[in-house]
Design a protein with these regions (language model features):
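Mid-domain Rossmann-like dinucleotide-binding core that forms the NAD(H)/NADP(H) cofactor-binding site
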Residues: 71-155, 159, 193
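NAD(P)H dinucleotide-binding glycine-rich loop of Rossmann-like/cofactor-binding domains
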Residues: 24-107
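Conserved amphipathic alpha-helix within the SDR
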Residues: 157-167
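Glycine-rich beta-strand-centered segment in the early N-terminal region that forms part
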Residues: 1-28, 70-72
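N-terminal Rossmann-like NAD(P) cofactor-binding module of classical short-chain dehydrogenase/reductase
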Residues: 17, 171-174
Length: 197
């Protein structure tokens, strides 16, 4: 309904995706595309200022931090493009160094975990194991490409993972639930020299 005086590329009525990272595009970190480390923005939405799950949002550096949404893109699909999907891809899959032939474990099958499942498949891992307490989420994970699913209520997760891969553990463990128990679980099932993201 309103754009600030400094905004030149976005006009009232435009459909946009709000990047979860605000970027000034002028600082040293932005110049080398480390936008999450922007000296003037970065991860400020939801931390330093109000977040974006609201009807009205103030977006710093709007010309750089808003992406126009083409009319032919479904708004429900676009919702994932602003936070869950890029977070899962960068922080989970890329930082987890997923490579072809790897074994990947994802702790948590919520929006970030499912997004990690989808984006990990871009790297052709040999196996993707998704772990969650919710059977409906595990069923969906299988439909979306998980090779294996584990419900921790069914027994020792480490033993179940070892039966799927080998006793050394997985190449990459992605923690997508945000609780201490799943962080510990990831440490228990990753192989020596593997990655936890």
């Amino acid at each position: 309904e309103e754009v600030g005086d400094a905004v030149k590329n976005i006009k009232v009525g435009d459909k946009v995706i709000i990047s979860c990272v605000s970027k000034c595009c002028t600082c040293d970190n932005c110049k080398i595309q480390l936008y999450s480390h922007c000296r003037n923005g970065g991860w400020i939405l939801g931390y330093m200022i109000d977040g974006t799950q609201a009807e009205y949002v103030r977006t710093p550096y709007a010309d750089n931090s808003l992406v126009p949404l083409p009319d032919n893109v479904n708004e429900e699909v676009a919702l994932l493009l602003s936070d869950a999907l890029p977070t899962a891809h960068e922080i989970g899959v890329q930082y987890g160094d997923v490579k072809p032939g790897d074994t990947v474990f994802i702790a948590g099958a919520g929006p970030v975990g499912m997004s990690a499942l989808l984006t990990a498949q871009l790297y052709s891992p040999a196996a993707i194991i998704v772990c969650d307490m919710d059977e409906n989420r595990l069923k969906l994970a299988k439909e979306l490409g998980a090779t294996h699913t584990i419900n921790p209520a069914s027994g020792d997760v480490s033993k179940q993972v070892a039966a799927i891969v080998d006793e050394d553990g997985v190449d990459c463990a992605i923690e997508a639930a945000g609780i201490p128990a799943t962080w510990n679980m990831c440490q228990d099932i990753v192989k020596p020299g593997g990655h936890i993201a």
